[in-house]
C-alpha cells in the first residue's frame, strides 16, 4: 500500500543541478561511474560530480532520486548530462580526494550525499564558483553547511534527512507499550548522529523511556557493541548513521537472536529487517534535491541564495514478517495508518 505522505517544506527557493557521463572505473577506497552524453538541441550540456560517502540502500536511493529529479526538470543523463559518480566507502580521507578530483576535472556542480561527502565537497569548492548541493544530511547547521536560520553559508544548499525523533518515540511507545529502555548505536565521529542523540535525550522522558547509547568508530565495532547493548534494552532505534546502516545485517542478526526489535530510520531498513519506522523515503528526498539542482544549473536560482529544504511529514512503514518473527503484536488500527506494509524481509 503505497500512499505517499510527503509534504515538502521549502525553507526558501529551489536549488541546484549539474551533469553526468559514464564509463566505469574504480580507485582504492572509491568507485567511479561515468557515462557518455550527447548535446541537447541548443548545445548545452552539464557535468555533475556525485560524491557518495558510503554504499548502502538509503544513500543509493538518494542518488537514484537525485538523477530522477534532474530528469524531471529536463536534465537527462546520456542526453545533456554527464554524471561522474564516486563512492568514498565510508572513508573521510577518500571523500576529500574525490572532491578535489571533481574540482580538477571542472564539473559544473558537486552533489555530496551524506555529511562527510558534502563537507569535503564544500571545502574543496570554497574558492571556486562551483555550487555544491547536499542531501542526506541530518543537521546542516551543526555540520557547518547552513546558518541557524537555514540560509547558506556559501555556494551550498540542499536537503536534510532529519529524523522525526518525537514521532519515532511515539511510534515505539504504541508498538511496545511496556518498553522502558531504548538502545542507540552510533558513530562517534558523525555529527549527524550527535545531533539526533541530543534530541532523543531531550524527548525520551516525555514518552517514559530511558536511553542506552553505545558509540562505535568503525563497522568492525558493531558485533561487540551489539553484544553489549542487547542485554540492557527493550528495543533499538536507529539513527541516520552511515556506519551503523552499513552494518545493518549484523545489527539485526544480533538483535533478533536476543529477541530485541530494531526500529529503522527510513524505509529501506524496514524492508531489510527492522520492525518499523516513522521515516522518510530517500528516493523522494533525492528527487527534491535533483529539482533544486536543476534550478541552479539552469540559472533560475543560486545555491548561495537558497535555504536548505526538508521533508516535513514522514509516514509509518511496518514489516509484519519481522513482527511475526519477534512475536510482536501491532494494533490493527495503528497498522492501518501505515503508508506501506512489508510482509517479507529482503535479503541483504
PLM ranges: what are they?
Residues 84-147, 241-263:
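Beta-alpha junction/loop-to-helix N-cap segments that form part of ligand/metal-binding clefts
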Residues 42, 139-181, 280-301:
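Hydrophobic alpha-helical segments within soluble ligand-binding/sensing domains
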Residues 19-38:
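Bacterial lipoprotein signal-peptidase II cleavage site
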Residues 46-73, 84-93, 189-193, 242-246:
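Extracytoplasmic "Venus flytrap"
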Residues 48, 66, 157-204, 307-323:
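An alpha-beta-alpha
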Residues 295-348:
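Hinge/cleft segment of the Venus flytrap/periplasmic-binding protein
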Residues 2-24:
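Sec-dependent N-terminal signal peptides of Gram-positive bacterial secreted proteins and lipoproteins
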Amino acid at each position: 500500500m503505497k500512499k505517499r505522505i510527503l509534504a515538502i517544506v521549502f525553507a526558501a527557493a529551489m536549488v541546484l543541478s549539474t551533469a553526468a557521463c559514464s564509463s566505469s572505473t574504480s580507485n582504492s577506497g572509491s568507485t567511479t561511474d561515468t557515462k557518455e552524453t550527447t548535446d541537447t538541441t541548443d548545445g548545452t550540456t552539464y557535468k555533475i560530480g556525485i560524491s557518495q560517502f558510503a554504499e548502502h540502500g538509503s544513500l543509493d536511493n538518494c542518488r537514484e532520486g537525485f538523477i530522477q529529479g534532474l530528469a524531471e526538470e529536463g536534465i537527462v543523463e546520456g542526453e545533456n548530462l554527464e554524471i561522474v559518480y564516486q563512492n568514498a566507502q565510508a572513508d573521510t580521507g577518500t571523500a576529500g580526494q574525490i572532491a578535489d578530483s571533481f574540482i580538477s576535472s571542472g564539473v559544473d556542480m558537486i552533489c555530496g550525499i551524506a555529511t562527510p561527502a558534502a563537507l569535503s565537497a564544500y571545502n574543496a569548492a570554497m574558492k571556486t564558483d562551483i555550487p555544491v548541493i547536499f542531501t542526506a544530511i541530518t543537521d546542516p547547521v551543526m555540520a557547518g553547511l547552513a546558518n541557524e536560520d537555514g540560509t547558506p553559508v556559501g555556494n551550498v544548499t540542499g536537503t536534510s534527512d532529519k529524523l522525526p525523533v518525537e514521532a519515532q518515540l511515539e511510534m515505539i511507545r504504541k508498538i511496545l507499550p511496556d518498553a522502558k529502555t531504548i538502545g542507540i548505536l552510533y558513530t562517534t565521529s558523525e555529527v549527524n548522529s550527535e545531533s539526533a542523540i541530543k534530541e532523543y535525550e531531550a524527548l525520551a522522558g516525555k514518552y517514559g523511556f530511558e536511553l542506552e547509547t553505545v558509540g562505535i568508530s568503525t563497522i568492525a565495532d558493531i558485533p561487540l557493541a551489539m553484544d553489549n547493548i542487547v542485554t540492557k534494552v527493550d528495543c533499538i532505534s536507529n539513527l541516520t548513521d552511515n556506519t551503523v546502516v552499513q552494518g545493518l545485517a549484523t545489527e539485526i542478526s544480533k538483535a533478533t537472536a536476543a529477541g530485541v526489535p530494531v526500529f529503522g530510520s527510513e524505509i529501506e531498513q524496514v524492508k531489510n529487517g527492522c520492525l518499523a519506522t516513522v521515516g522518510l523515503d530517500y528516493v523522494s528526498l533525492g528527487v527534491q534535491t535533483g529539482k533544486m539542482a536543476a534550478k541552479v544549473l539552469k540559472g533560475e536560482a543560486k545555491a548561495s541564495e537558497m535555504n536548505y529544504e526538508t521533508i516535513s511529514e514522514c509516514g509509518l512503514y511496518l514489516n509484519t514478517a519481522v513482527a511475526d518473527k519477534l512475536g510482536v503484536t501491532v494494533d490493527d488500527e495503528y497498522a492501518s495508518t501505515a503508508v506501506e506494509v512489508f510482509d517479507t524481509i529482503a535479503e541483504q
